[in-house]
A protein has these predicted regions:
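A cross-taxa feature marking solvent-exposed loop/turn segments within ectodomains of secreted
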Residues: 104, 117-119
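N-terminal non-catalytic structural scaffold regions of very large proteins
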Residues: 1-92, 111-112, 117, 125, ...
Length: 155
């Protein structure tokens, strides 16, 4: 018996559980996920490679098999990326233009130059439907001139 829960997650044979998406790794549909039974706060959904999860004592004993609900395109999940590029006029604008054309909602933007002022570090959080959409956004930002790296972060 598969039971759908809020958050777009399906858990084998369990209903009435409080489900939440873990903030430490922010999984999105398409990520390999696992449920972690917390003490008093229901089940936290983590990416399988979450270092925070693996740091928990005896964590394997508290894991549940979970999967993403199919055809779950209406939910929005938060993704975080770090962008590193040349600190040039218009870089932030170019990055935000890509995001506004490809995502539903930008949550946070933090841009800072390096100490020598030559490069910029930009952290952005935004709403995303799934992993393939996130990959598309990352690929488009990588094509912005003078962007040297784009990587997904946990928050």
């Amino acid at each position: 018996l598969k039971v759908k829960h809020e958050g777009g997650v399906v858990i084998q044979g369990a209903s009435g559980l409080l489900i939440r998406i873990a903030k430490c790794c922010n999984p999105v549909p398409g990520d390999d996920i696992v449920g972690y039974i917390t003490k008093g706060r229901g089940v936290a959904i983590h990416r399988q490679d979450c270092m925070n999860l693996k740091a928990q004592e005896n964590y394997e004993q508290r894991l549940l098999d979970v999967e993403w609900e199919e055809n779950n395109s209406t939910k929005e999940y938060t993704a975080h990326i770090d962008i590193y590029g040349l600190n040039r006029s218009g870089l932030l604008n170019d990055v935000l233009q890509v995001l506004s054309n490809t995502t539903k909602n930008i949550s946070t933007v933090n841009a800072q130059p390096t100490k020598d002022m030559k490069f910029a570090n930009i952290h952005v959080s935004f709403g995303i439907a799934n992993l393939s959409m996130l990959t598309t956004v990352v690929d488009k930002i990588k094509s912005v001139p003078e962007v040297y790296s784009v990587k997904r972060t946990n928050g």
